[in-house]
Amino acid sequence: MKTISNSTLNENVLLPDYDRSTLKSRIVHLGFGAFHRAHQALFTNEMLSKTGSDWGICEINLFGGEDLIQSLRAQDHLYTVAEKGAESTEVKVIGSVTESLHPSLDSIQAVLEKMAEPQVAIVSMTITEKGYCADPATGTLDKNNPLVIADLANPTEPKSALGYIVQALKIRRERGLTPFTVMSCDNVQENGHVAKAAILEFAQLLDPELRDWIETNVTFPCTMVDRIVPAATEETLTEIAELLGCEDPCGIACEPFRQWVIEDNFVAGRPDWNVAGAEFVADVVPYEEMKLRMLNGSHSFLAYLGYLGGYAHISDTMTDEGYRKAAFDMMMQAQAPSLTMPEGTDLEGYAKLLIERFTNPSLKHKTWQIAMDGSQKIPQRMGGSLRFHLAQGSNFSWLATAIAGWMRYVSGVDEQGNDIDVRDPMAETLRQICDQHGLNVSVVPALLAVEAIFPVELGQNPQVIDAVSSAYQSLIDNGARATVAAL
């Protein structure tokens, strides 16, 4: 079978230009998904190209993804990333992966032994928010989670990422080895703190002494990651095969932009990812807030109002001058003033770059996809800036319009009377409220009263109720496109 490792590839493909045989698995990564392939593994590939160091990655999938691991092995752990710009595509073969494991292909013990090897200095992860087994209401470990229950009952045969990390650290401690750094790369606010809290709480239930050792000896740097990486489709893989010169079932496409901000807090050394464009900083939080409010907040605005306006993709909304202007104004007038950034941060430059990213037509990022899980996203993306404007007495009409757009969207019926497939953990609750009120402005205070989404000081604030009601009424009377154009 022809694969990347034994085929003559097209001449414009960028191949690893370093000696892969010298690499050691100094990083173990949990979660060989699309984002990691286009982000951390690619940064590592470029770092290796520039430094000639020996930081290789052992990839591990704990749940599903066996096919992906087998495909990766069949092609000597090489795979492709296609960076698709508006005008052209750059194809890179990534060589930073040294080996791979899967508990159901190898064994649980094989995974634990790999994590316990002396040269392993970092265990990184992209396991999604669910992987941290936290109770959404309290943020603490969900002791009723079936994985947590199973791992506490049988810690030497773990199932969860938490179980594997704690057991591997226990083995290292018993063998007198230095611990590794635990580095979350998930798109979760203060992800290092989330990982640390979950792991310490889990370890406390298992062995309080081990918990204390972990707290004293292990570091959990926070990271901020950014790159748009749509899920791979048959169309993507066909396109990659044509660009590459052979098939690659592990291939992934993404945008050219990438960002990685890392808290410089490592217990056993780290690669010089900064030579590949990563930034090492003392505090990641300001950068997270910048991304959450300016990128994610305007993304949500475009998702709800774009979908209602009949636009299938984010790039389609950017062909409408009203949406383009409103998104930029929202970033600069509603979100940027609410941020406290390190000196010299160019927020206007960042906003212009975001508009350029949103305009990229080759990504096909669906408004419907970004509109998912709004009840979880809106508080993070808009709550902080809403509080800022209420305190300052300044204009927050863009935020009010975004929230009204979400309310109109979760009614489950679009402007043509067609059903909307609303995907949200609270979809049922939201649907009941919307059904009670119909497309009537009385739905606004009813939805603002849902405290799991809007804390009382926001949801019961008369200015918020008035501004969102006014925007909602405009959506009913004039539709999304006219409402956005009038901002």
Model features per residue range: what roles?
Residues 1-487:
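Substrate/ligand-engaging "lid" and interaction regions
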